[in-house]
Amino acid sequence: DYHKAVDNPQAPTLFAAIHAAEWNKAVQITPSFTLEKAECDYTDPATLFPHGIDVVYFDAFAPEKQPERWAEEPLRRIFDAMNPGGVLTTYCAKGEIRRRLQSIGFVVERLAGPPAGKREILRATKPQL
């Protein structure tokens, strides 16, 4: 629940810690949450891509503006790098993107977007083995 998370008294401190975390380095945010922000070009097949990913916040511009970011092959690379049960979220809720994520193997749900923002968002989960 969005409001429950935002109303958490620790939210501002956690938010700041997440954004201040160094790139390409594991940073412990809480005792049960370690964040490693990976800076890499997932659209380039030659790029070494991290594996063992649990969460992807996919914030590319719209498919019309950055079609290479939404192509099947780069999205498949993300899927392949994720752990079973890993979650990808995106503000893009277009049907073509939902169907593409499903065809790659994700289980995709439409969720209500945040207040004063997008009407819907997508949550794509890599199935457990």
Outline where the language-model segments fall:
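S-adenosyl-L-methionine
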Residues: 1-49
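Short SAM/SAH-binding signature in class I
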Residues: 35, 51-60
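Hydrophobic/aromatic beta-strand patches that form the interior of the parallel beta-sheet core
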Residues: 36-38, 89, 109
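Conserved beta-strand signature within the Rossmann-like core of class I S-adenosyl-L-methionine
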Residues: 55-57, 84-92
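Short glycine-rich, flexible loops that bind phosphorylated cofactors or substrates
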Residues: 64-66
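A short glycine-rich, Lys/Arg-flanked "PGG" loop and its adjoining helix->strand segment in the class I
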Residues: 68-84
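Short alpha-helix
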Residues: 93-104
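Core SAM-dependent methyltransferase catalytic element
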Residues: 104-129
